[in-house]
């Protein structure tokens, strides 16, 4: 069985991922920068579908209009030559010192600049064919509880997103926004730290249909949460507009590991995306190990795609993967589909004596989760996929 990725698999990478130079708070870069054109070419050779970018990844901050046009022209030529796509773009509103905050800054001029910088890159994203625009609020928050009124900050954030939604609508762009939640870093207390926070915020916007979420594996795990549950809720809400795949080793700083971390959880993530019919790109937001040279960078990118394809297979190809799938399963749960409704409305429920008066509490308490034969009506809807897991062996 081949695990060679093809564009049909829709694997994408950010310029900032394979282009990460290995710089961290305690050490300088271990690799030189990567030319975006080379990135496009190498990822295409590996079988990727597309590439994503922050504005400053493609056009260094402060570039003149002439320099910007030159960078874009070279990038577009590389896309045309390789057939690579740009499904998503985003804005760097966190690196330059002006962005101590951004959409929620106490300084009105900083807020206005952040929105205008975003609008400029939205134009480029739409020009390159992007369908999703990700917004990560890494600088939205505080280290001191008295530094900012959170209610005012949320009002400011709402104003910014409403303006962006108005702009996209006025321009007629076929573009939706995906808010990327993250806790703990770089601000001590970040606004919209989890999928749930983002979903609640979206409902207060003027055009909620334009906004969804871009959950990242490591970000939910940084908060000690269950990532498959988070993306399941996003799918349930119809708001999974994009997804960032990577690995994380527990509650700590944002590691952005490749898929080598937590393969058991990866099984559930991949199965959920595939069984739910998610049609968006499978985007890897990871950092190649700081210890690697460029050969290791491309090997790690290739490994991300290969591991996804391995986990996607209904029957694992190797004993280690089988063990991972068994450990990831909940052996006593035999179904992943919803059961039949409680009743045909409230009146029918109140009239149903088996729901309360005649309900055998002790018998139900003694019943295990695995039931044979299956209760009448508790079957999968037509065409609904289910998780198939090998039985546990001791």
From Swiss-Prot:
Q: What is its EC number?
A: 5.3.1.5
* Binding, Mg(2+) 2: 216, 219, 254, 256
Question: Which PROSITE patterns does the entry link to?
Answer: XYLOSE_ISOMERASE
Tell me where it resides.
Answer: Cytoplasm
Q: Which reaction does it catalyse?
A: alpha-D-xylose = alpha-D-xylulofuranose
Q: How, per the record, is the cofactor bound?
A: Binds 2 magnesium ions per subunit.
State whether keyword Metal-binding applies: yes
The biological processes this protein is annotated with in GO are:
D-xylose metabolic process
The GO molecular function terms of this record are:
magnesium ion binding; xylose isomerase activity
What are its cofactors? Mg(2+)
Self-association state and partner proteins as the record states: Homotetramer.
> Could you tell me what this protein is called?
Xylose isomerase
Organism equals Streptomyces rochei
């Amino acid at each position: 069985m081949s695990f060679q990725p093809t564009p049909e698999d829709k694997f994408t990478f950010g310029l900032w991922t394979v282009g990460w130079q290995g710089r961290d708070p305690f050490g300088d870069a271990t690799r030189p920068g990567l030319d975006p054109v080379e990135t496009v070419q190498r990822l295409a050779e590996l079988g990727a579908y597309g590439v994503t970018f922050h504005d400053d990844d493609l056009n260094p901050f402060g570039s003149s209009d002439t320099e910007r046009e030159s960078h874009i022209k070279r990038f577009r030529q590389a896309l045309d030559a390789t057939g690579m796509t740009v499904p998503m773009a985003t804005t760097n509103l966190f690196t330059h010192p002006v962005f101590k905050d951004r959409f929620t800054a106490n300084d009105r001029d900083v807020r206005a600049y952040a929105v205008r910088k975003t609008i400029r890159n939205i134009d480029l994203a739409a020009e390159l064919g992007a369908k999703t625009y990700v917004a990560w609020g890494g600088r939205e928050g505080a280290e001191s509880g008295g530094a900012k009124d959170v209610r005012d900050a949320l009002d400011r954030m709402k104003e910014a997103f409403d303006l962006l939604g108005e702009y996209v609508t006025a321009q007629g762009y076929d573009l939706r926004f995906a808010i990327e939640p993250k806790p703990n870093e770089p601000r001590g207390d970040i606004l919209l730290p989890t999928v749930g926070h983002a979903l609640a915020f979206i409902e207060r916007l003027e055009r909620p249909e334009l906004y969804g979420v871009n959950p990242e594996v490591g970000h939910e795990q940084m908060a000690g949460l269950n990532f498959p549950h988070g993306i399941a809720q996003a799918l349930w809400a119809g708001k999974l507009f994009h997804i960032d795949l990577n690995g994380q080793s527990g509650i700590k700083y944002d590691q952005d590991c490749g898929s080598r971390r937590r393969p058991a959880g990866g099984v559930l993530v991949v199965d959920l995306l595939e069984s739910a019919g998610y049609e968006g790109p499978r985007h890897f937001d990871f950092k190649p190990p700081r210890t690697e040279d460029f050969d290791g960078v491309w090997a790690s990118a290739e490994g991300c795609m290969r591991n996804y394809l391995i986990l996607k297979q209904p029957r694992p190809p190797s004993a280690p993967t089988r063990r991972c799938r068994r450990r990831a399963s909940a052996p006593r749960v035999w179904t992943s589909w919803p059961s039949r409704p409680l009743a045909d409305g409230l009146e029918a429920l109140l009239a149903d004596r088996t729901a309360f008066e005649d309900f055998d509490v002790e018998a139900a308490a003694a019943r295990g989760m695995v039931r044979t034969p299956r209760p009448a009506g508790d079957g999968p809807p037509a065409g609904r996929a289910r998780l198939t897991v090998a039985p546990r062996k001791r």
